[in-house]
A protein has these predicted regions:
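Short, flexible turn/loop "capping" segments at secondary-structure junctions
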Residues: 46-48, 148
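Short, flexible segments with low predicted structural confidence
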Residues: 25-26, 36, 81-83, 97-101, ...
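Polybasic "coupling" helices that flank or enter modular domains
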Residues: 111-183
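Cyclic nucleotide-binding regulatory module and flanking cytosolic helices
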Residues: 9-44, 99
Length: 183
């Protein structure tokens, strides 16, 4: 769920720095520490090089990621041209929604724009956590609600705002994002 939040620093023991980032994120969402520890056990650290794909068109998305470092581009190919639909960075979840939830081939590509570090969790683990961990289920539902709201806002903005107005909104809501994108 691509939403950035400020960090809070809490002593989470001797975890890997990337795992601490995810734990801090979950703490900021109000999940209890015991639930967070059992949730984050299911995540694995993955390094991606610039240009490496997290999801490729035609392949089924088996993993959801949490970005601890780096930028990612969501795009479609149309007539051989890349059409970027979204760019996201640290402290955001990363997934091809339709492919992940339907477990069907993806229509989009998600590619690292910079060297990146992500934490990944397999689809089966997400489904298991939804059944076994009430705190995760509550987080999952809230995240999906926020995603639906964000998608509705995007749809509305595409209809009622000009390209210039959408660009100004991007500058207002994500002032650092454009500076981070490599040219």
């Amino acid at each position: 769920i691509p939403i950035s939040y400020p960090f809070i620093f809490v002593n989470l023991g001797k975890q890997k720095p990337t795992l601490k980032t995810l734990q801090t994120y979950f703490l900021s969402k109000g999940l209890p520490l015991q639930a967070i520890e059992s949730i984050t056990e299911s995540f694995q650290t993955k390094q991606l090089d610039k240009g490496e794909y997290f999801v490729q068109e035609g392949r089924t998305s088996k993993y959801m990621g949490f970005i601890t470092q780096g930028l990612f581009q969501y795009y479609y190919l149309k007539d051989g041209k890349e059409i970027t639909t979204y760019v996201t960075g640290a402290n955001a979840f990363l997934l091809s929604l339709s492919s992940f939830f339907k477990q069907a081939p993806s229509l989009e590509n998600i590619r690292a724009m910079t060297e990146a570090t992500i934490l990944t969790i397999h689809y089966d683990e997400v489904m298991r956590l939804k059944k076994e961990n009430e705190a995760f289920l509550a987080f999952y539902i809230a995240a999906l609600e926020n995603l639906v709201i964000s998608m509705d806002d995007t749809r509305t903005n595409l209809i009622i705002l000009s390209a210039e107005e959408r660009y100004q909104l991007l500058l207002k809501n994500e002032p650092d994002l454009l500076r981070q994108i490599p040219l």
